[in-house]
Amino acid sequence: MSQFPALEDFDDGLVTAPVDDSKNNTDFLEREKLALGEDAGQFETPEDKDALLNFENDSEAEQTRFEQNFPPIDAEMQASGTFSAPKAPYMGQAEVHPPEDESGDPEPVRKWKEDQMKRIQERDESSKKLRESNIEKARKAIDDFYENFNDKRDKVIAKSRKEQEKLLEENESKSTGTTSWERILKLIDLSDKPEAHGRSTERFRELLISLAKDSNAPGAAGTTVSSSS
């Protein structure tokens, strides 16, 4: 934007030329002196003259600065109808700044963000590897558990089967014999043990032995003995 007012503003009366106030003030003082006549000197002091001179000097200095900044339009107009360049540039040349980073962050902040992102990625990768390792260990532990469980179960089943077969064989061997009394003798304990009340079972053992030896003894063939016999 130009520092000079537009010509249209002068035509519309929006901008007016500066008025020399020093001349008006001087005329006013002269009129006052004429009105007072000879008594005007009584009201005049040296300070009044100094103030008037200072005011005139200030007005002249202000007028000079205005004429330097705003020269007459008719003198500055060129043939092309455009304003000439001002004596003093309105603005200095704009300072050229180097292009900033697209992110708008200073270099230390940008570097810190990059390091932070790198640490986060490394931590995520480490967590992922640890998770996969834990899952693999858990699967292996489950497989080992079922493998050991099945192995132990098979061993227990095999042991139980052997013990069952052994028991059946023992029962079969004990139950074999020519007579029922022989099988009974194999199932009972014939050792000489004292009874709790001091009674001896020797007589009973002798009776069972004699019955086992006699193939014709009652009940030797497994038949029920009647009361009449």
Swiss-Prot record:
A Gene Ontology molecular function term of the record: clathrin heavy chain binding
UniProt feature, compositional bias: Basic and acidic residues: 107-132
Coiled-coil spans in chain: none
Pfam families according to UniProt: Clathrin_lg_ch
Localization per Swiss-Prot or TrEMBL: Cytoplasmic vesicle membrane; Membrane, Coated pit
Region (Disordered) location: 1-24, 76-132
Swiss-Prot/TrEMBL keywords: Coated pit, Cytoplasmic vesicle, Membrane, Phosphoprotein
Membrane topology, from the record: Peripheral membrane protein
Residue positions, PTM Phosphoserine: 229
GO biological process: clathrin-dependent endocytosis; exocytosis; intracellular protein transport
GO CC term (a single one): endosome
Task of the protein: Clathrin is the major protein of the polyhedral coat of coated pits and vesicles.
Quaternary structure note: Clathrin coats are formed from molecules containing 3 heavy chains and 3 light chains.
Family of the protein in this entry: Belongs to the clathrin light chain family.
Name assigned to this protein: Clathrin light chain
UniProt gene name: clc1
